[in-house]
Every structure is written in structure tokens, then in C-alpha cells.
């Protein structure tokens, strides 16, 4: 099994963190400079990071028994999604953000009375939506990897719910930061979509982030190349 390089994951999660940071500025610019009263009843200006005090749901897509996409060499989407999500969680928490993970281990979050794979997948996705809607969170970000029959495609793609302006801004923020930091030749823009269950039913600002194509063998080879890793880290 090919293991996604740690430096690559660090770059991905840093870009996502920066994007959430930027989006939080857009959501609440007034929170950058708040006011409080000192003991002499004088107004004192205080500052905090834009994500400080925010609650963000990070959704690592798929999970055993549903591994999601898988490359020809055995790299699984579910495992990589979780690695990225845990690192994003760590960065956000260091900045004073409360992070809710839909899953924190290899397993999907289906109900115990689910028996077939189909039942488990349906239960899992509904539970993810439930977490998002009951969390009172500010943002919901779902981490995924892509795979299609054509092998030539590579790069990032972010999706959001049509007609939801805040989700639109969130997805655009993530897409633009990933393009600038990882693949300047990637000219994709965030896309609206309405046939994904999480996108349709999570009520807070939501974006699905497809972090790359497991179907592209050259992209996967690059993940193991030292020079490419160094360029990403730079």
C-alpha cells in the first residue's frame, strides 16, 4: 500500500486552515477588534484571531467498511481523509477554535442496527448531517479524495450548495488558497452542486473539498518523490 507523504498532508491541512482563517474574517470582521471596559470604565481594544471562539465541523469522508476511492496501488481515501482531518483539527484548536470531528478513527459512524453495506452507508451519511445540524457550528468542511476512469485529471475541487452565499464564499476561499499554494496551474473554481446529500442537508456554511485524484498514477508517484515533496513544503 502506498502511504501519502506526511509533508503533502501537512501542506493540504495548512491550506485548508488558512482558508478557514480567511473565511472567518469575512464572516465576522468586527470580531478582529472587540471592545471591553476596564476597571476605570474606559474602553480598551482587544484582539483575537478570526477563528478563535468559532466552532468548525471537520468531516473525514468515508470510513470502514466504506473505504471510498482507492488507487491502483492501494492508497485508500478513507485513511487519507482522516489523516488530513486530524491535522486540520490540531491547527484550528491551537488557534482557539472548537473542532468537532464526525469521526476520529478508521470507522464510519453508522448505527449499530445497520446490517448491509448499503444500510451502513446511508446511516453514516445521515449521522454526519445530524452532527452538523445539531452542533451549532459556524462551518462544516468535508474532506474527500477523487477518482474517475480518466487518469489524466489531477488537482483540487471544492463544492458548495447552490444559492447559499456563505457556502459559496467558504468553498471559493478554500479553492483559491489551494490553487495558490499547491498547484498554480490549477485553474478550477469552486463549483455549485445540488446532488450530494451532505451539501443538500447540512444547514450551516458547508463545502466538500476533493483534495486530489487517486486515479492519476503520475500524481500519486509525485507524492513519493523527494524533490516534489520539497517543492510542496517550500
Descriptions of predicted regions:
Residues 1-234:
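Catalytic-site microenvironment of enzymes
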